């Protein structure tokens, strides 16, 4: 297989791309708990299936923040390409043919349970799990929004901005973007909102930084994923490595698309 993952792993990738953070990680963890995939295969899934959803990228970021659906589609294309690239790179993560788990084995072990379980119980468990996940996501967003406000009011954010100034100078990125970038590293939505609102003659910088933050996810998303993965025997390392690589690749793909297709050239 392209990702060295059983076919059922495609469900985690598709749902992760469609539903946004942290659905991919939750599905990968559930696969491990139910022995659908081996530990190594689930860790590979963790590295690339946890992504921002198209509704958030196109609707919230593209249309609401940047005022352009084209920018939203540009960010989405780069995001997906980067995710697939990371998945291909991680196909060799702890690769061992003996570690593969047969889906037939899973079916034989759990067929009786699936038959006995009634529809009401299944729906109830799904709804309960969904509500808990939504509350967790909302709680993290609120907490980190408060943290950002505290950092901003206490001038700690200003200190952090000065720390990354040499890097921004090296990359020829205006210092006006530093606050938005740091905010995005902490909490993705707040950071993207700041970056998209900065008036800059070269809009490509806004888009490139947004692409990086969208793929990285930030500390808030990382802790969401960690709270899910901690309930299993999976390592969080593939997720960390994968998100860093995805952020880099996503930025590169965005840069290539902007400079290769006139429809994506937003230099004003």
Annotate each language-model stretch with its function:
Residues 72-88:
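Alpha-helical transmembrane segments
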Residues 68-69, 87, 91-103, 153, ...:
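Transmembrane helix-loop junctions in multipass membrane proteins, especially transporters and channels
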Residues 84, 201-268:
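C-terminal transmembrane helix pair
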């Amino acid at each position: 297989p392209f990702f060295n993952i059983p076919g059922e792993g495609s469900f985690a990738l598709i749902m992760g791309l469609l539903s946004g953070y942290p659905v991919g990680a939750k599905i990968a963890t559930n696969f491990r708990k139910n022995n659908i995939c081996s530990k190594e295969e689930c860790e590979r899934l963790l590295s690339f299936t946890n992504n921002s959803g198209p509704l958030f990228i196109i609707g919230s970021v593209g249309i609401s923040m940047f005022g352009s659906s084209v920018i939203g589609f540009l960010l989405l294309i780069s995001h997906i390409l980067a995710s697939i690239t990371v998945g291909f790179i991680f196909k060799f993560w702890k690769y061992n043919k003996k570690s593969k788990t047969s889906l037939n084995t899973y079916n034989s072990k759990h067929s009786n349970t699936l038959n006995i379980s009634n529809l009401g119980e299944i729906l109830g468990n799904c709804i309960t799990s969904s509500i808990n996940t939504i509350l967790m996501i909302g709680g993290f967003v609120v907490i980190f929004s408060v943290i950002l406000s505290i950092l901003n009011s206490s001038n700690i954010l200003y200190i952090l901005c000065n720390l990354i100034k040499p890097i921004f100078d090296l990359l020829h990125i205006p210092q006006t973007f530093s606050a938005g970038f740091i905010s995005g590293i902490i909490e993705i939505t707040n950071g993207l909102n700041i970056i998209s609102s900065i008036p800059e003659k070269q809009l490509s910088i806004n888009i490139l930084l947004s692409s990086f933050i969208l793929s990285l996810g930030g500390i808030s998303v990382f802790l969401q994923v960690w709270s899910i993965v901690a309930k299993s025997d999976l390592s969080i390392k593939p997720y960390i490595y994968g998100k860093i690589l995805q952020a880099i690749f996503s930025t590169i793909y965005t840069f290539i698309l902007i400079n290769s297709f006139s429809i994506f050239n937003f230099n004003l």
